[in-house]
Design a protein with these regions (language model features):
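Short hydrophobic beta-strand element within catalytic cores of glycosyltransferases
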Residues: 178-181, 188-192
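Acidic donor-binding loop of glycosyltransferase active sites
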Residues: 44, 160-174, 185-188
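Donor nucleotide-sugar binding/catalytic pocket of nucleotide-sugar-dependent glycosyltransferases
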Residues: 6-7, 25-80
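Acceptor-binding helix/loop patch of EC 2.4 sugar-transfer enzymes
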Residues: 1-34, 96
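Conserved catalytic-core segment of nucleotide-activated headgroup transferases in glycan assembly
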Residues: 19, 56-59, 67-161
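Short acidic/histidine- and often glycine-rich active-site loop of Leloir-type glycosyltransferases
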Residues: 193-202
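Short, acidic/turn-prone active-site loops that include or flank metal/cofactor-
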Residues: 2-7, 71-74, 151-153, 195-196
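Generic beta-sheet signal
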Residues: 1-2, 49, 69, 129, ...
């Protein structure tokens, strides 16, 4: 089996305001970890995507030793077509936009970082590219300089429009495909420590 310990996210979600939310996510973490433990022990081999994930696995499910099988990226698909359409003030964020870590990360970035960037660079543009944007994500399209695309046929053209890719995730583990894809496109990436933690020395 290829494993990801989603139970590790629950304590982060439990930081949400309100005692009910904390209770729900605390309970969910315990139940999910018990399920993950049963599944891991039912398989003869387990694989994780990074050394960070392996250490987490060892800590949470003692006695089961996973192997590391890193994520890959299709370098032919994620290949830059050149700079003809590149906006020197453009930034791009990619991901499924009803996934809570993506929603949290991009909302935090627009609230905490974007105003200062726009004040310094009035022509700055941010493209939030990905399917199923929540109402909260769609609302970011009302912020000056921000465009929420919804689903697109392919992300490489959007990488080619931008001067930088961002990955401001606060709830993240493993290796982020959005980071690998941007790197494959030869695009600089500004990532949070959480989004970069599975990349080792890259």
């Amino acid at each position: 089996q290829c494993a990801e310990l989603d139970s590790d996210n629950c304590p982060h979600y439990a930081a949400a305001p309100g005692p009910l939310g904390r209770w729900i996510y605390g309970r969910e973490a315990r139940r999910l970890l018990a399920f993950e433990d049963r599944v891991a022990r039912a398989f003869s081999r387990s694989f994780v995507v990074s050394e960070v994930e392996r250490e987490l696995f060892r800590r949470c499910i003692p006695g089961v030793e996973p192997d590391v099988l890193p994520n890959g990226v299709d370098v032919e698909h994620f290949r830059s077509a050149g700079d003809a359409d590149r906006d020197p003030h453009g930034a791009v964020f990619t991901g499924v936009m009803d996934y809570e870590p993506n929603v949290d990360g991009v909302r935090w970035f627009v609230a905490r970082c974007w105003p200062a960037l726009r004040a310094r660079f009035p022509a700055a543009r941010l493209w939030i590219v990905g399917s199923r944007p929540t109402p909260a994500v769609r609302a970011l399209g009302d912020v000056p300089g921000v465009t929420v695309t919804g689903r697109v046929e392919a992300t490489p053209p959007w990488f080619d429009r931008a001067a930088v890719a961002i990955a401001p995730l606060r709830l993240a583990r493993g290796v982020q495909n959005k980071v690998l894809e941007a790197m494959s496109m030869a695009l600089p990436v500004v990532a949070s420590p959480q989004a970069a933690q599975g990349l080792g020395d890259l």
